[in-house]
């Protein structure tokens, strides 16, 4: 019996996995930056930075894989999405640069630590907001004519994209706070737990707002979620999201350490699954499906061989790094 694999679908899931890995791994780094002004100047800020110092730069590997995979496997989508979101992409990259430089120089230039702390927060906030707005710009639809972007410079700036941007900021803050609940102890952990409770409610409210907005955003989105028989297949996503949300709020009300972080990851997983269900099979709504934007099959197969070799290595290295630096963070840090 011959089994046929759709390489385009395989590549769609590879890129979705890379994006999810980036969001949840670099998300808590950015979340700590977003929350940084709420931490006490001195040891509390240092411990927060030390908790991510060994892993933050490696987490961005997934962003490179996701972006590079989009360029290689779906070149038409890459050629449309970038011109439509150039200001957001530029803002995101500049934010990541400021975040990275500030991370290193706050230790090497203690005389200007307040300046670097502000750059760390500003870069993290800008990067998170830009990523969320880019997602919103994609979901609301991009105008394509003759296989090229046909919109204006500011089509990405709408109330909906601002909502998705704020939702991403709140979600990253939740990841950052629950990461610190896991990695810190004492008064710093208690402070992180209080921040996580607020961030959890903000995330859930904004997720609900985005979900309701999606139903009126495009007719096909409402059909996907509200009509039979589609609703029977997609209903488990919001149901499981609700279950995870309740478990998360309960875990933050008791003295749990790692559980809130894992539940936050699960919340992100189901949130992104819901967005995937909403968009499928479009890679650039409303006109380009994954098959419309895909590279030739021989190119996809060639790249799949490379990914089959490199992705397990990346996963293994990432797992090893997190294992080596497991446990609570003390005052003596990576730097």
Map each language-model feature to its residues.
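Short, membrane-exposed interhelical loops at transmembrane-helix boundaries
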Residues: 284-303
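Membrane-interface helix-loop-helix modules in multi-pass inner-membrane proteins
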Residues: 55-126, 145, 224-232
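N-terminal signal-anchor module of multipass membrane proteins
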Residues: 1-58, 64-67
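Long, contiguous internal "core" modules enriched in hydrophobic/ aromatic residues
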Residues: 105-260, 274
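Helix-coil boundary and interhelical linker segments in multi-pass alpha-helical membrane proteins
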Residues: 1-13, 71-85, 139-159, 216
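Alpha-helical transmembrane segments
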Residues: 11-22, 82-94, 121-126, 155-169, ...
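Transmembrane alpha-helical segments of integral membrane proteins
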Residues: 99-106, 278-290
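Juxtamembrane membrane-water interface segments of multi-pass membrane proteins
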Residues: 30-54, 71-81, 104-114, 176-195, ...
């Amino acid at each position: 019996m011959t089994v046929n694999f759709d390489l385009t679908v395989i590549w769609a899931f590879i890129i979705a996995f890379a994006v999810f890995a980036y969001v949840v791994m670099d998300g808590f780094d950015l979340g700590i930056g977003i929350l940084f002004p709420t931490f006490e100047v001195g040891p509390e800020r240092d411990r927060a930075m030390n908790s991510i110092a060994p892993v933050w730069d490696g987490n961005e590997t997934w962003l490179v894989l996701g972006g590079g995979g989009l360029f290689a496997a779906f070149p038409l989508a890459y050629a449309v999405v970038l011109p439509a979101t150039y200001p957001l992409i530029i803002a995101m990259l500049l934010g990541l640069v400021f975040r990275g430089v500030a991370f290193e120089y706050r230790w090497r230039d203690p005389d200007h630590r307040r300046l670097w702390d502000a750059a760390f927060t500003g870069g993290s906030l800008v990067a998170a907001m830009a990523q969320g707005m880019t997602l919103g710009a994609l979901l609301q639809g991009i105008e394509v004519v003759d296989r090229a972007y046909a919109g204006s410079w500011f089509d990405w700036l709408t109330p909906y994209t601002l909502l998705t941007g704020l939702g991403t900021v709140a979600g990253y803050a939740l990841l950052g706070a629950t990461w610190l609940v896991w990695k810190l102890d004492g008064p710093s952990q208690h402070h992180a737990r209080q921040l996580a409770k607020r961030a959890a409610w903000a995330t859930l409210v904004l997720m609900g707002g985005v979900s309701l907005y999606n139903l009126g955003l495009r007719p096909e989105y409402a059909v996907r979620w509200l009509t039979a028989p589609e609703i029977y297949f997609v209903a488990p996503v919001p149901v499981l999201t609700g279950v995870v949300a309740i478990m998360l709020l309960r875990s933050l009300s008791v003295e749990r350490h790692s559980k809130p972080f894992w539940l936050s990851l699960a919340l992100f997983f189901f949130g992104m699954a819901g967005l995937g269900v909403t968009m499928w099979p479009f890679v650039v709504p409303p006109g380009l499906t994954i098959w419309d934007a895909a590279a030739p099959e021989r190119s996809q197969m060639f790249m799949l061989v490379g990914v089959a070799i490199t992705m397990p290595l990346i996963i293994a290295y990432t797992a090893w790094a997190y294992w080596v630096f497991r446990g609570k963070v003390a005052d003596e840090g990576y730097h």
